[in-house]
From Swiss-Prot:
InterPro entries hit by this protein: Alpha/beta_knot_MTases, RlmH-like, tRNA_m1G_MTases_N
Protein species of origin: Xylella fastidiosa (strain Temecula1 / ATCC 700964)
This protein's UniProt keywords: Cytoplasm, Methyltransferase, rRNA processing, S-adenosyl-L-methionine, Transferase
SUPFAM superfamilies assigned to the protein according to its UniProt record, in alphabetical order: alpha/beta knot (SSF75217)
Gene: rlmH
Cell location: Cytoplasm
Record protein name field: Ribosomal RNA large subunit methyltransferase H
Gene Ontology CC entries for this record: cytoplasm
Swiss-Prot/TrEMBL catalytic activity: pseudouridine(1915) in 23S rRNA + S-adenosyl-L-methionine = N(3)-methylpseudouridine(1915) in 23S rRNA + S-adenosyl-L-homocysteine + H(+)
NCBIfam families recorded: PRK00103.1-4 (NF000986), tRNA_RlmH_YbeA (TIGR00246)
Length: 158
């Protein structure tokens, strides 16, 4: 059976993000079991080195990956998808028979190593979003894609 992971850099999300994530995670679990793996972020202080933080977090992400994953990296330079396109991608990903992994980076983004192993890059658009909020948006969009594929009334379309 395909394993689906959401690997997100960051811990201690605001309560409202955790509650929203839990709700959509519960709804999605009937169609696609998803496991959240939280990666410890690098320390950010007065002498913060952004590149070092990206590399440290990247190593932790790489260590959390299952064998031979199909990695979809959330990246501002990725391909933007509308809800129907995401549903089509979900159908494709499910048919691959590989472990599916969604990767959410920290405040500075992903290491080059993480970007290099990505099979696809998905952009939520040109907006700058708090990385903690992205996990909620992703799980809601995955749920929406599932409802499109199952003709559930949650997604009313155009």
């Amino acid at each position: 059976m395909m394993k689906c992971l959401l690997i997100a850099t960051g811990q201690h999300v605001p309560t409202w993000v955790a509650q929203g994530f839990a709700e959509y995670h519960r709804r999605l679990s009937y169609w696609l079991p998803l496991e959240l793996v939280e990666i410890e972020p690098s320390m950010r202080g007065k002498n913060h080195d952004p590149q070092r933080a990206i590399e440290d977090e990247g190593r932790r992400v790489m260590a959390a990956l299952p064998k031979q994953p199909y990695a979809v990296t959330l990246d501002v330079k990725g391909k933007p998808l509308n809800s129907e396109q995401l549903a089509q991608r979900m159908e494709h990903w499910r048919g691959l028979g590989r472990n599916l992994v969604f990767l959410i980076g920290g405040p500075e983004g992903h290491s080059q190593e993480v970007l290099n192993i990505s099979n696809e890059r998905w952009s939520l658009g040109p907006l700058t979003l708090p990385h903690m909020l992205v996990r909620l948006i992703v799980v809601e969009q995955l749920y929406r894609a599932a409802t499109i594929l199952t003709n559930h009334p949650y997604h009313r379309g155009k």
